[in-house]
Amino acid sequence: MSCRRVFFNYRALSLGRRCQRSSLRLSLGLIVLFCVLSPLRSFGAEADPKFKPGEELLDAGRIAQAEEFAAKVLKEEPKSPAALDFDARVKFYQGRYAEALAIVDRALAIDSSNQRRQALKLFSQLTLDVHKSLKPFESAHFVLFADEKRDGILVPYALDTLEKTYQTTGAELGFFPKEKVRVEIAPDATSFNAISTLSLRDIEETGAVGICKFNKLMIISPRALSFGYRWLDSLSHEYQHYAIVSLSNNQAPIWLHEGMARFYETRWRKPAPAKDAAEDYLTPANQTLLVHALEKNQFVGFKKMEPSLIYLETPEQVQLAYAEAASAVDFINQSKGRDGVRELLATLNDKATPEAIEKVYGMSFDNFESKWKGFLKSKGLKEIEGSRVRKLKVKKDQREDEEVVELKEIQSAVARNRTYLADQLFAKGRAAAAANEYQRALQASPRSPVILYKLGRIMVETNRPDDALPLFQQALEIDPDNVNIYVQLGRAEHAKKNFKEARAALEEAIQINPFNPLIYRLLGDAYAALGDQEKARAARTTLERLSASRN
């Protein structure tokens, strides 16, 4: 999700959840007032021309200059509620939440009737409440805040990915921020809603699991979602937004924001990317969506992506928009390479997008769109049968949620019913009978990654890893973001003593949902067999930590 537009989503302040936060000590009427207000551009006082330069500095991530601006206006009008509001926002953007709250209280003591000011107090309090459970962890260029007890195992992977992203993004875009970048991992959906303003609907319907906003990167813990999600790529994705805001002075359009973020989000995995690494954005589902868009000439279009992709109507539209935007960045890269991208971002500082495109690439924006579509057609994209846009699900009861979600992903009713029966047989220890039912289900839906994975799991359970491997490989060709497939693939390779391949599969699983203890039991063996005793010890330590947390 983009950080260019800084909106406060009042709808996200769910009445029920807010009422549960007794520490806020707010009246029911005040909470209702906040929930019915329409989205506004910023917190604080009503729009005042004198604060516009400061607002622009904040939105462009120029926090030090915004702080100087706040000091200047406060010196001129030390008792101005509007000046205090702006100073509070600066403190908030610096992560100084308690100070922001105290300053807002001072402004409210002077004028308590301003609704935006009341909302800023509420949001500052919510953020401060969440932050009380988070602990800071630092690396060379980042300060990461996470719940150590629940999400501590994420920290080393997150910081390693962020540092790799810092280097790969710097190499591509020439962006090397000197100040450490603030990152926050929300431990659950309620906390994520509180600090990000993204709602449960935004998570489950549009896949909004991360956001770059308020001068920081925020994601939800993969532990909070059934099956997790590509959380490390999401951290990298949000950092791309952070870079784009700075390099374009917050002037990049949403399609360029989201296109670049999607295009570059996997570069951290490949510091020296292979020739085809640029096409990592073409997941099976995204490629299929683009094929359909080309066939029907039904694109989301760059204009409809404004002001944010979360306002599109369906998950399919959101993912098509990402695919369109990323493919446009692919086209841009192939036109003039990284130098062209850097020049475009710099040109956007003082030119509108159409003029910037014309200056850098020598064509009108209409011509650019036309050539981009021609570029797409020339790629010869093919529909990947069985691929579907994955819908995220906030976890309630892990076992029940996963079983229900998996069954819903099977399109054929016949295959779904047979799979359900096979699941029941497997749960009762009747592996052979379950395998027969999974095979019957596969006859009705031969390209279902869920059924392929479940049948492969039975093969591993019955000591037939050679039969399991092709099933897992076929499933990954359709659904490369399914954590369960990687875990079972790692298990099969481990059974065959293919420890290098097992390590690769299990490390991929960590990138999606690192909370399965089996990952670390198998990884400990794989690392030890490959002679990496330090990583073997680390895997065993993580296993012990996860096991202890479940007792």
For the regions a protein language model found, what residue spans apply to each?
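Amphipathic alpha-helical substructures
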Residues: 64, 93, 98, 272-318, ...
